[in-house]
Structures are given as structure tokens and as C-alpha cells.
């Protein structure tokens, strides 16, 4: 198995490029991305880059496979992982919202979401006796078809909701991209991570 000076976990998709560029600007010598089928980028002794699904980034960082990662706050709210979160990077802004069909005011008995842990906590805090249905595809469809009385999902512009004929009832949390750091790595690789964190704070204005 190859050994690296530092391993970075980044989410695939729209957040990847911005995360990659901001880490480069902060002075991290990231490897070039060689192709979509490459699971691990980097040369032995250098910086390695893992391209992961959003929900997998906190897991890889928490378990020490990667020392640092970038992921949305929405994912962190659902993950339950004990990670150091030193920098709000500011991009990838969205919100987690409660969504229903127009005019629906009845009790919520079933909620569909990609964020089951966050949603379960919300229901418990509010004393709502509702079931949580975890889905991975088009969450809005669950409300449109009546599979669920409400959905908890990410909203950016609201265009998707309007197109589906749904309404945003309540904003539950705001989300942006965050730098996350493995707590043990923060101690063991302090000489590398401390200046990187400081530079990212300067770049993000946080």
C-alpha cells in the first residue's frame, strides 16, 4: 500500500472543483486528477486525493483514512461524526428545508429525506410522531406522489420546488462547504495542517 504525506477527501460533483481550487490556492500541492475511474490520485510521499460520494467524506476523515476533507454542512449535520470543523469555506451555499404540497396543513406522519439522522432528531425535538423514509433519488417526488406528507431536502434557488408545485414551509439549517479535519491528525500533523487551516481562513474571510 502506498504511503502519502497527507490524504485529502473531496466530494464528487459540483463542489469538487471549487474545493480543489481553494486547497491549491492555500498552497496544498494536490495531484492532477487523472480520470474519473481513478479512485486514488497521488504519488507516494506526496499528497493523495480521494474522490468520494458526499456522505462518505466524513466517514473517511473520521476513521483516519484521510486527514482532511471538504464537505457540505448539510452532510455533516446528518453524519454524526466527531470531526474538527475549523473553516467555513463559503461556497456551495444551500439550505435544508421542510417541504410540503401547497395547502397541506394536516399532521405529518411520514417524512422522506436523504438526511435520515438529521430528520429523526428534528422530529424528536418537536415531538412529532412521524416515520422517516430514507430515499436517494428525487426527494420531491415523494411529496408529489403522496409517498410522504413532507420532505426534508436541500434547496438552492427553489426552482426545482416550484417546477414540482411544492412549497418551502420552513428553513431548518443553512449549509456551505466546510473543511473537516481528523482530530488525531490535527495533533500528529500539526506542522502541515495548522498553516493550511490559517491560509484557508484568510482566503475564505472566516
Curated annotation (Swiss-Prot):
Localization of this protein: Cytoplasm
This protein's name: ATP phosphoribosyltransferase
Family, per entry: Belongs to the ATP phosphoribosyltransferase family. Short subfamily.
Pfam families membership: HisG
Main location: cytoplasm
Top EC category: transferase
E.C. number: 2.4.2.17
Encoding gene, per UniProt annotation: hisG
GO BP terms in the entry: L-histidine biosynthetic process
Membrane spanning residue stretches: none
Keywords from the named record: Amino-acid biosynthesis, ATP-binding, Cytoplasm, Glycosyltransferase, Histidine biosynthesis, Nucleotide-binding, Transferase
Pathway field: Amino-acid biosynthesis; L-histidine biosynthesis; L-histidine from 5-phospho-alpha-D-ribose 1-diphosphate: step 1/9
Keyword Disulfide bond: no
Reactions the enzyme catalyzes: 1-(5-phospho-beta-D-ribosyl)-ATP + diphosphate = 5-phospho-alpha-D-ribose 1-diphosphate + ATP
Molecular functions (GO terms): ATP binding; ATP phosphoribosyltransferase activity
Annotated domain remarks: Lacks the C-terminal regulatory region which is replaced by HisZ.
Entries under CDD domains matching the protein: PBP2_HisGs (cd13595)
Quaternary assembly: Heteromultimer composed of HisG and HisZ subunits.
InterPro entries documented for this protein: ATP_PRibTrfase_cat, ATP_PRibTrfase_CS, ATP_PRibTrfase_HisG, ATP_PRibTrfase_HisG_short
Amino acid at each position: 500500500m502506498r504511503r502519502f504525506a497527507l490524504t485529502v477527501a473531496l466530494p464528487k460533483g459540483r463542489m469538487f472543483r471549487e474545493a480543489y481550487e481553494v486547497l491549491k490556492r492555500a498552497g496544498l500541492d494536490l495531484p492532477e486528477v487523472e480520470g474519473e475511474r481513478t479512485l486514488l490520485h497521488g504519488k507516494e510521499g506526496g499528497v493523495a486525493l480521494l474522490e468520494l460520494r458526499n456522505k462518505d467524506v466524513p466517514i473517511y476523515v473520521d476513521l483516519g483514512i484521510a486527514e482532511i476533507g471538504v464537505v457540505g454542512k448539510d452532510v455533516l449535520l446528518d453524519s454524526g461524526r466527531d470531526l474538527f470543523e475549523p473553516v467555513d469555506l463559503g461556497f456551495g451555499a444551500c439550505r435544508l428545508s421542510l417541504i410540503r404540497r401547497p395547502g397541506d396543513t394536516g399532521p405529518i406522519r411520514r417524512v422522506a429525506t436523504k438526511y435520515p439522522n438529521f430528520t429523526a432528531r428534528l422530529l424528536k425535538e418537536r415531538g412529532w410522531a412521524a416515520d422517516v423514509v430514507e430515499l436517494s433519488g428525487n426527494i420531491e417526488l415523494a411529496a408529489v406522489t403522496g409517498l410522504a406528507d413532507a420532505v426534508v431536502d436541500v434547496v438552492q434557488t427553489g426552482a426545482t420546488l416550484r417546477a414540482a408545485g411544492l412549497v418551502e414551509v420552513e428553513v431548518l439549517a443553512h449549509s456551505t462547504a466546510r473543511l473537516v479535519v481528523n482530530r488525531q491528525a490535527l495533533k500528529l500533523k500539526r506542522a502541515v495542517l495548522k498553516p493550511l487551516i490559517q491560509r484557508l481562513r484568510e482566503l475564505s474571510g472566516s
